[in-house]
Amino acid sequence: MREIVHIQAGQCGNQIGAKFWEVISDEHGVDPTGTYHGDSDLQLERINVYFNEATGRKICPRAMLMDLEPGTMDSVRAGPFGQLFRPDNFVFGQSGAGNNWAKGHYTEGAELIDSVLDVVRKEAEGCDCLQGFQITHSLGGGTGSGMGTLLISKIREKYPDRIMETFSVFPSPKVSDTVVEPYNATLSVHQLVENADEVMCIDNEALYDICFRTLKPTTPTYGDLNHLVSAVISGVTSCLRFPGQLNSDLRKLAVNLIPFPRLHFFMIGFAPLTSRGSQQYRALTVPELTQQMFDAKNMMCASDPRHGRYLTASAMFRGRMSTKEVDEQMLNVQNKNSSYFVEWIPNNIKSSVCDIPPKGLKMSSTFIGNSTAIQEMFKRVAEQFTAMFRRKAFLHWYTGEGMDEMEFTEAESNMNDLVSEYQQYQDATAEEEGEFDDEEEMDV
């Protein structure tokens, strides 16, 4: 089966990951002790995408948890599904990375990385046909960003032909958790551009906005935010885990969404977003889902898709519906909003349909868009980076761990190149490209 090995790094990654395993276990009818209590054979049919059957019929996640300090791990272990994980798969240091990318990537992280890779190797060896890896981490801290990207590059060396998908929490525009976020994020993006296949961009502020607007809790907790993210992670892989009419997997997703190798940073969204209390009162239709899914307010990262154009997009529907209706809606979206889609990639929405909806809903949809508007996010981080780097503020923390200023300069220019690549394709028209083709033919 097409297994996926899940890796969570740092505090943020572990908290999102813990929530994700609650959602997935619930979908497959697995209780916190690792026993199956489901009511349908479909839950078991492909349960081994994310789970492994251990001795004594215990079902265990194919998960690897790592951090440079024990705190978050302890709370995951003490959490509702803490007993589900294999005890050997918790790998942690004692010193912490102290929000310092260099500590995570070069010093503290490098000491721990071999024991992490051992666990990854064991999990990968336990798979029949490994599809790839998914990593949850944040880019603002030290461990998730520094050690997370170190692990990604090591896995890349070892498994070059497997898909590497990350769920990366970017620094938010208005709220900042740490002062050195711009440094950590820029150094991480520098790595992700080269070593990841698909990066789903998330940010806390956008998640807060979604929570306030639609889910209407009085004060959204991180638990609520992480729940939103888990819904998307679950949606992305639902076709692998349940039967469907139009299947998709991580590789199909990459092939359909990435027109140029460096442009693999995606916006994600989910529908229906209704508050927990009012779920049962709303009947949903495919047009409603589509409209909500493409709504700019539903994007889980702080970029407005209306400020750019979609190169490609993917819509994954779950629930009982006709594929004909899905196709009509996708066509409808492209025709009505044609100015928001580049004209030189015709029919640029991939859709897939999985028959089994998530718990508590009749139907749902997950949206993944490759939009040029994502450059707003990179621009914002780059500006903050430049402001500090020009004065060499806080640099001694990084150079003290053995980093070189040159690496900062390279990361900065890589990020700026990425922004201008997005801009170039946003401005490109079908006609221009055509002219170049004619010239080439004439040369022959």
Curated annotation (Swiss-Prot):
Signal peptide: none annotated. Mg(2+) binds at E69. It is found in: Cytoplasm, Cytoskeleton. InterPro entries: Beta-tubulin_BS, Beta_tubulin, Tub_FtsZ_C, Tubulin, Tubulin/FtsZ-like_C, Tubulin/FtsZ_2-layer-sand-dom, Tubulin/FtsZ_GTPase_sf, Tubulin_C. This is Tubulin beta chain. Dimer of alpha and beta chains. A typical microtubule is a hollow water-filled tube with an outer diameter of 25 nm and an inner diameter of 15 nM. Alpha-beta heterodimers associate head-to-tail to form protofilaments running lengthwise along the microtubule wall with the beta-tubulin subunit facing the microtubule plus end conferring a structural polarity. Microtubules usually have 13 protofilaments but different protofilament numbers can be found in some organisms and specialized cells. Its cofactor is Mg(2+). The keyword Heme does not apply. GO terms for biological process: microtubule-based process. Keywords: Cytoplasm, Cytoskeleton, GTP-binding, Magnesium, Metal-binding, Microtubule, Nucleotide-binding. Belongs to the tubulin family. PROSITE patterns: TUBULIN, TUBULIN_B_AUTOREG. GTP binds at Q11, E69, S138, G142, T143, G144, N204, N226. It comes from Euplotes focardii. Pfam families: Tubulin, Tubulin_C. Residues 423-444 are annotated as: Disordered. Residues 429-444 have a biased composition (Acidic residues).
